[in-house]
Amino acid sequence: MAKTLSRSTASCVAKRFFSTSNAVASPSPLPSHLISRRFSPTIFHAVGYIPALTRFTTIRTRMDRSGGSYSPLKSGSNFSDRPPTEMAPLFPGCDYEHWLIVMEKPGGENAQKQQMIDCYVQTLAKIVGSEEEARKKIYNVSCERYFGFGCEIDEETSNKLEGLPGVLFVLPDSYVDPEFKDYGAELFVNGEVVPRPPERQRRMVELTNQRGSDKPKYHDRIRNVRRRENMR
């Protein structure tokens, strides 16, 4: 049974995995107060997906609630079309309206890509009411290095994904490429996988590889997460 991570829990998981490659190879255990006996098997099972996951979109939190619509193909480098936020963003795009849903591999070892995508759509449809609506809300999918999808839903709706079959983590998403407001993985527009222009794809690969070697600033991230929680 999967458990949706709270903001504070997500930040602690992020602190564990936002480390150098050596730290990923020999990770320290999660704090015991975050893992109950009931949920520890699920969390440790999901942990196996995180190193690959962070190559696309790392587990991050941010303190603002941005509005506006998201279109990775139409968005440019200008952030002025986004409304004012509560505080300066730590991770652009992490607005608690875009969520990364990490899943177990759907359909078994021999599942085809389209079968996996259908499973993602069906999973979200259980929450939003129909597969047609689910296709509109999913903005990216991953069927290779990790399994899951990104969807644009509010925080209350994201909580309803907790415990659905196959769901491991429900995490706030953030941009891999802030210049183009791009969350990474494969773009999913109007129910179909859409390729990026070649130059955008090359840029995405470079950013993805770079992110694997970046050393995060844990203390600033955790301090601002706590600040956000104190404001609630």
From Swiss-Prot:
One of its GO terms (cellular component) is endoplasmic reticulum. InterPro entries: MORF/ORRM1/DAG-like, MORF/ORRM1/DAG-like_MORF, S8pro/Inhibitor_I9_sf. Residues 1-67 form a transit peptide. The keyword Transcription does not apply. It is found in: Mitochondrion. One of its GO terms (molecular function) is mRNA binding. Residues 212-232 have a biased composition (Basic and acidic residues). GO terms for biological process: cytidine to uridine editing; mitochondrial mRNA modification; mRNA processing. Keywords: Mitochondrion, mRNA processing, Transit peptide. Pfam families: MORF_dom (PF21864). Involved in organellar RNA editing. Required for the processing of few RNA editing sites in mitochondria. Belongs to the MORF family. Heterodimers with MORF8/RIP1, MORF3/RIP3, MORF6/RIP6, MORF7/RIP7 and MORF9/RIP9. This is Multiple organellar RNA editing factor 6, mitochondrial. It comes from Arabidopsis thaliana. The lineage of its organism: Eukaryota, Viridiplantae, Streptophyta, Embryophyta, Tracheophyta. The gene is MORF6.
